[in-house]
Amino acid sequence: MTTREYDYIICGAGSAGNVLATRLTEDPDVTVLLLEAGGPDYRFDFRTQMPAALAYPLQGRRYNWAYETDPEPHMDNRRMECGRGKGLGGSSLINGMCYIRGNALDYDNWSTHKGLENWTYLDCLPYFKKAETRDVGPNDYHGGSGPVSVTTSKPGVNPLFEAMVDAGVQAGYPRTDDLNGYQQEGFGPMDRTVTPKGRRASTARGYLDQAKVRPNLEIVTHALADRILFDGKRASGVTYLRGSERATAHARREVLVCSGAIASPQLLQRSGVGPGAWLKELDIPVVLDLPGVGQNLQDHLEMYIQYECKEPVSLYPALKWWNQPKIGLEWMLNGTGLGASNHFEAGGFIRTRDDDPWPNIQYHFLPVAINYNGSNAIEMHGFQAHVGSMRSPSRGRVKLRSRDPNDHPSILFNYMAEALDWREFRDAIRATREIMRQPALDRYRGRELNPGADCKSDKELDAFVRARAETAFHPSCSCKMGYDDMAVVDEEGRVHGLDGLRVVDASIMPIITTGNLNAPTIMIAEKIADKIRGRTPLARVDVPYFVANGAPARNVAKAVRQPETV
C-alpha cells in the first residue's frame, strides 16, 4: 500500500472536480491530488470529441457508468437508464453539450432557504461569466475569457430550427434571443459547449488543459475512491483502488467529494456518513448519522414528440453508414460540417399555466427522429421535440447496496409520483401539438409518429408517458445544501457535523434548476472554489432579468392558429 500527502484530495474529475483542481492549483504553494475512476480524455476518440457523435459514449461502459434504476413504480416498473460520465471530464465528456444556466428565479428561490442568502442569481452570475468564453463575445450576461468555450447557434444551419422557433412564437409564446440572458422564457437559439474548432468543450479540455502542467497538481486516472478516512470527526484522507492495488492519500486540509449525484452519496455512505439505519444494515461503522445523504434525489424526465418531415431536410441521411465517413473527414480536417454540431441548436422554455412563476417545461428541438442514446431511429425523414417538466415534486434516493466500491448503488428516482407530474406532462404534450400545427411548420410537418394523433385522452397520454418517457440525464440534489433536517452541506459545501470534508457537484443543489445541469455545476464549483481559497467573492452583477409577475403564459389572442377543441 502506498501513502502520499496533499493539501487537498478531490474525488472525481468531472464538471466540478476539474474546476476545483484548476482553481486551487492557481496557488503555487497548494498541492492537489485529483482522483478519477475512469480513464484519460482521449482527444482522438471521435466518440467523445465529435459533437454529433454524442450518442456513442452512452452505448458502452468505457465512458459511462451505465447505472440503472430500481423498477420505477409509476413507470410500468421499468428499470430506467441513468448514464453518468466516467473519465476526465465526467459527464461533460458524454453529455449533450447544451449550455443552459437555469432560470434566474431558480437561484433566487434557493436564496430564500435559511443560510443560502448568497446564492441569488446576481450572486451566481459573475461565476457563470468567469467560466465562459462565448464565441460572439462578452456582454452583461456572458463571459469572454473563461475556460469553457460556448458556441451560439447561427442562422442557416437547418431550416427546421428556425421553423420550430417561429412555430413557438406563432403559438403565442415569447421569442428570446438568449436563453441564458435577460429572458430564458420563450423560444430561441441554444448555446452549446463546443469549441471554435468544432470539438466538445468538456471541463477536461477547458480546465485541466491549463492545470495539468502544474507541478502542484497530480492527476491519477483509473483510481476508484473506496472510502474517506477520518480522524475522529475530521476527514483525513482517502483510500482508493487502481485495479487490485490499494493506495492511501492523506489530506492536510480537506477532502473534496465531486463524484456526482449518484456516486457522491454512495462514497459518503460507504465511508460511514449517511442514514444510520442504512449503514448498520451493511455493518458499516457510523462516523456520522446524517439522514439526508442520498435523499432528495431529483432528475428531469422527458419524452420525444416525433413527426414525419415532408421535405428532405432532416438529419436522416447522416444516420446511414455510407454518409458518415465524409461527415467525419470534414469534421476531423476542418472542424466544420454536420459533425461539428450536437444538433440541439434551438429550444425553449414555457410556462403551461399563468400561475407558474417561471418556466416549468423545457424544449430541445432536433431535426431527426431518434432516441437520445441513438436507439429507435425512425427510418424516414423526421424531426422531434424533446419535452419535459423542470421541477417535479417527486423525490427519490440513492442507497448503498454493499461495501464493495465496484457495486452500483440502489437508485430510485420515484418518477411521476405526484399528481402535478401527470398534469404537467399532459399539458406539455398538448402544448407541443399546438406548436407543431402552426404555419411555420406546414411545409415540413407530416403525420405525428409518437405518441400518434389517436393518443388524445388523459388516460392515453399517461400510458404513453409511463411507457416511453426517459431520463434527461440530470440527476441532482442528493446531498443538498441548507440547514433543515435533511440538509447535508452548508452554503460552502461543507458537510454538516464534520471537518475537512466538502461535497461540490450537482448533488448539493437544494432544488433542481430549470434546464441542463452542466453549466450550473461548473458555476457552483467556481463559486465554492473562492470560498475554499479564502478569496473575496466576486461582486454581484446588477443586471435586469425577466420576471413574469403573473403575466399570461401564452398570448392566445396572437396565436396564428387557435387551439383545437377536443
Curated annotation (Swiss-Prot):
Keywords on record: FAD, Flavoprotein, NAD, Oxidoreductase
GO biological processes: glycine betaine biosynthetic process from choline
List of residues binding FAD: 7-36
Pathway per the UniProt entry: Amine and polyamine biosynthesis; betaine biosynthesis via choline pathway; betaine aldehyde from choline (cytochrome c reductase route): step 1/1
Gene Ontology terms for molecular function: betaine-aldehyde dehydrogenase (NAD+) activity; choline dehydrogenase activity; flavin adenine dinucleotide binding
E.C. numbers: 1.1.99.1, 1.2.1.8
Region (Disordered): 180-202
Active site: H474 (proton acceptor)
Organism domain of life: Bacteria
Cofactor: FAD
Pfam family, one: GMC_oxred_C
A cellular component term, taken from the record's GO annotations: membrane
Reaction it catalyzes: choline + A = betaine aldehyde + AH2; betaine aldehyde + NAD(+) + H2O = glycine betaine + NADH + 2 H(+)
Physiological role: Involved in the biosynthesis of the osmoprotectant glycine betaine. Catalyzes the oxidation of choline to betaine aldehyde and betaine aldehyde to glycine betaine at the same rate.
Family per record: Belongs to the GMC oxidoreductase family.
NCBIfam families attached to this UniProt entry: betA, PRK02106.1
Protein name: Oxygen-dependent choline dehydrogenase
Organism lineage string: Bacteria, Pseudomonadati, Pseudomonadota, Betaproteobacteria, Burkholderiales
